[in-house]
Amino acid sequence: MFERSRYTIDQIDPEIFAAIQKENQRQEDHIELIASENYTSPAVMAAQGSQLTNKYAEGYPGKRYYGGCEYVDVVEQLAIDRVKQLFGAEAANVQPNSGSQANQGVFFAVLKPGDTIMGMSLAEGGHLTHGMALNMSGKWFNVVSYGLNAQEDIDYDALEALAQEKKPKLIIAGASAFALRIDFERIGKIAKSIGAYFMVDMAHYAGLIAAGVYPNPVPHADFVTTTTHKSLRGPRGGVILMKAEHEKAINSAIFPGIQGGPLMHVIAGKAVAFKEALSPEFKAYQEQVVKNAAAMAETLMARGLRIVSGRTESHVMLVDLRAKKITGKEAEKVLGDAHITVNKNAIPNDPEKPFVTSGVRLGSPAMTTRGFKEAEAVKVAHLIADVLDNPHDEANIAAVRAKVAELTKQFPVYG
């Protein structure tokens, strides 16, 4: 028997407890601007830490290979129903353990090794699972990539011409470092014109889409994949939305195709996050996410930094650092020293190596969760510029760090 009072983390494993405590303090003390990170609610974390972690449940609600699944069936069905409502989808699979596995599930359902797929170039803002050479998608399939035009928007004309020429079996839309609105309807029509499947990976934009502040790809795509964290503010995991005609193939591809028993405690966390995302408060939050990103981008441009594409229409932006004569790797380090967390990121046609880069990627979801509004977003942008204007002055870094501390104390993550 486990006595709850005796089996606490601090008593059983002080080393892990200490690391958790330090990470909690880091999250409170640092301004988080990594676009793919956010803070889950205590309710989501409670679901993930529940007894549901004990239950094996291979299969799907009502069709399990294990007994004792009557309550986890309720949990999974709620997650399915809520995510369908959230995005207006005909069918959904909530079992993928990650966004990458959601993408793999679609590939396993409709592709064979050697088939041609078409996705956005990683170097111009795409994602490694959309055909990057070292990824499974690049090793198993013949990959053709589309990119950006001179205005650093997706080159839809070139995309269409390439699709007509190469006739891919699957066209993928979605990005990990692209700030503008994606014309899912147009790409969907291109896919339909050549008889290709159309998959959208909306992992970065899912929260915005749920709130109606970014175009919804669901009406235009055969498959829509997403993570459940990032802007959606749920647990780390994945989901596949699909047309009803593809439900059987996708379900078989996930189980038994590429996964075994689902993580029921994570699915519970997903269900809670979907309920939160259906609320009016979540819509207001996402509206503020977009406002904060725009305010930050405008301020950075006023301070002499170039924003790739000239603006942001979402939660994310790429900052070209070459005018400041600093690399993305260096900027990530000095901003981190000032307690502003960012990630280095390649810009289009980047002359630097991928581990060095000429840019950083910034996102507004996490700071907006803290309660930051436009005024704070402007302050944060000025603090970033202050660091980049004088990155090797320790007194300057210390002064910025002190100003960051004032903001983080005023806006705690978990009050």
Curated annotation (Swiss-Prot):
A GO BP annotation: glycine biosynthetic process from serine
Localization (cell): Cytoplasm
Pathway of action: One-carbon metabolism; tetrahydrofolate interconversion; Amino-acid biosynthesis; glycine biosynthesis; glycine from L-serine: step 1/1
InterPro entries hit by this protein: PyrdxlP-dep_Trfase, PyrdxlP-dep_Trfase_major, PyrdxlP-dep_Trfase_small, Ser_HO-MeTrfase, Ser_HO-MeTrfase-like, Ser_HO-MeTrfase_PLP_BS, SHMT-like_dom
Keyword annotations: Amino-acid biosynthesis, Cytoplasm, One-carbon metabolism, Pyridoxal phosphate, Transferase
Pfam families: SHMT
Binding sites annotated in the UniProt record for (6S)-5,6,7,8-tetrahydrofolate: 122, 126-128
Cleavable signal peptide: none
Catalyzed chemical reaction(s): (6R)-5,10-methylene-5,6,7,8-tetrahydrofolate + glycine + H2O = (6S)-5,6,7,8-tetrahydrofolate + L-serine
Keyword hit for Cytoplasm: yes
Residues the UniProt record annotates as site (Plays an important role in substrate specificity): 229
Modified residues (N6-(pyridoxal phosphate)lysine): 230
HAMAP family, A to Z: SHMT
Name assigned to this protein: Serine hydroxymethyltransferase
Organism: Ralstonia pickettii (strain 12J)
